[in-house]
Amino acid sequence: IAVPAFGPSLLFGLGEGAVLPIIPLMARDLGASVPMAALVVALISIGSLLNNIPASLITMRWGERGAIVAAGLWSGLGLALCVLTSHLALFATGCLMVGMSQAVYNLARQIYMTEAVPIAYRARALSTLGGVMRIGMFIGPFLGAAAIHAFGLQAAFGVGIAGVLGAAAIGARVPDLETPPTPPGQTPPAATTIVSTLRDHRHVFLTLGLGVVLVSAVRASRQVVIPLWADHLALAPAVASLVYGLAGGIDMLVFYPAGKVMDHKGRRWVAVPSMLIMGMAMLWMPFTSGFNTLLLASLSIGFGNGIGSGMIMTLGADHSPRHGRAHFLGVWRLMSDIGSSCGPVLLSFLAGSLSLAAGIAATGLIAFAAAGALAYWIPKTHGSERS
C-alpha cells in the first residue's frame, strides 16, 4: 500500500529537488542576468499558482490517476525542454511547465488520499504525504550533485526527468476510486463550478482560508530567512548551508507523530503550536549573534514547520465537500500559493525599506496572527467531513 500511495510523491519530490538548485545556474549559462535568473526560478511558483484552478478541472475530467500520470509526463517534458534548448525563453517555458505540473500533481494526490483513507487516519496520511515529498526534495540535490560531478551540469536534469517519470509510472498503477452511487430515490447533485464553490463555501474561504494564507506566507519566508540572516552574521556559505540542512533534517523527523496527534487530539493541537513555535523562533532570530544561537533558532523553525506537515492539506480535506471536492481544493491550494508568493515579497520589501531584522520580526508576528486565526476558526471536532 505504501508504494502506490507515497512512492510517486517521493520520486516527484526527488526529481524536482535535483534540478531546483541548478535552474538559476543554467539560466545564467544561457545569458540571463542575476535578476532574470531569479525570475526564471520564480516561474515555477508562478506556474503552480496560475494552474491551481485548471488543475481542478483536469482532475475532475481525467480522474486522480490520469492527472498524476499527466503531471509526471508534463513535468518530464518541461525538464527535457530545459536541458535540450539553448534559448533562454524556451528554458523559462520549461520551468513554467514544471510549476504547472506541480499544481496538477499535488491536487490529484491530495484528493486521492482524502477519499481513499478513512477520516480517522486522514491527518497521518496527509502528513506522511507531505513529509515524504520533503524527503524527496531533500535527497534530490545530493543525487543531482553526484550526477553533475560524474557527467556535467545538465546531468541533474536527467535525474529530475527520471524522478518525475518514475512517479508517473507508479501513479499509473494506482487503482481508480469508485464514485459512491446515488441512494435510491435521491436526485443526483447538480454539477458544481468554481463560481458555485466560491459562493457555497465563502465563509470557510474568508475565515480559515485567510489563516491558511498567513501560514503559507510564514512557511515560504522561512526558506529565505535562515540563509539571509546567516549572511548578515557574516557566516561562511558552507556554514549557512549546514544550518539550513540541519533545520530541514528536523523538519523531516516529526511529520508522522504530528499527524498522529492531529488524528487523536484534533487539528488545533498541532496547527496552533506549529505557528507559535515558528513565530517565537522568528522573533528570536534577529537577536542571534553567531553560529550556535542561529542554529538553535533555525532548528526551532524547522521543528515548528515539521509538526505542521500536511496541516494545510488536512484542513482542506476536512472542509471539502464530497461533491465538487476538486473545485474546493483547487481554490484552497490557490489561497495557499498566494500566501507562499506574498510572504517572501513582504519580507523583501521590509528588509529594503527598514531592515532585515524588521522583516524577520514582522514574519514572526504574522505567524502569531496565523496561530490566532487557526485557534479561532478550526472546528473543535477532529474533522469536519461534509456530505
Feature names for model-found ranges:
Residues N51-G63, V254-G266:
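Helix-to-loop junctions at the C-terminal end of transmembrane segments
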Residues G63, L84-A89, G266, T288-S289:
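Helix-breaking motifs and short loop linkers at transmembrane-helix boundaries and internal kinks
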Residues E16, M97-R109, S300-I312:
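Core transmembrane helices of Major Facilitator Superfamily
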Residues D176-L208:
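Juxtamembrane intracellular "pre-TM" segments in multi-pass secondary transporters
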Residues A67-A80, I161, W269-L283:
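Structural signature of the two symmetry-related core transmembrane helices
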Residues I1-A42, T207, R219-W229, L233:
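Helix-loop boundary and gating motifs at the non-cytosolic
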Residues L96-M133:
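Cytoplasmic helix-loop-helix junction between adjacent transmembrane helices
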Residues A162-P183, A370-I378:
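C-terminal membrane-cytosol helix-exit motif in multi-pass small-molecule transporters
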